[in-house]
Design a protein with these regions (language model features):
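Short glycine-/aliphatic-rich beta-strand segments at the starts of folded cytosolic domains
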Residues: 1-12
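Short beta-strand-to-loop capping motifs
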Residues: 10-12, 46-51
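Short amphipathic alpha-helix segments
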Residues: 11-28
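Secondary-structure boundary/capping signal
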Residues: 16, 32-33, 53
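Short acidic amphipathic segments
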Residues: 25, 31-37
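Surface-exposed aromatic
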Residues: 39-44
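C-terminal structural segments of small proteins and small subunits
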Residues: 48-72
Length: 72
């Protein structure tokens, strides 16, 4: 199966939010790489993964009070 790339605009505010995401994403072994651009006003989250949907990512982020919206 081929890697998928998802890009989200988020409500990430700081490095503490990024630490929370790191802890969360350790529960998802199909997420291979991810990064956040804190310099961008939309706080872009980019994820490379297998066998996970954008809805799965959105739901997971909501559990740690991070709002996200997929960009197309």
């Amino acid at each position: 199966m081929q890697n998928q790339i998802f890009i989200f605009r988020t409500s990430i505010k700081n490095k503490q939010d990024i630490k929370s995401i790191k802890t969360l994403f350790t529960q998802y072994p199909t997420i291979h790489k991810w990064n956040v651009d804190l310099e961008d006003w939309e706080k872009i989250l980019r994820i490379e993964c297998l066998e996970i949907t954008p809805i799965d990512v959105l739901n997971a982020l909501q559990t740690i009070n991070i709002y996200a919206e997929e960009l197309e």
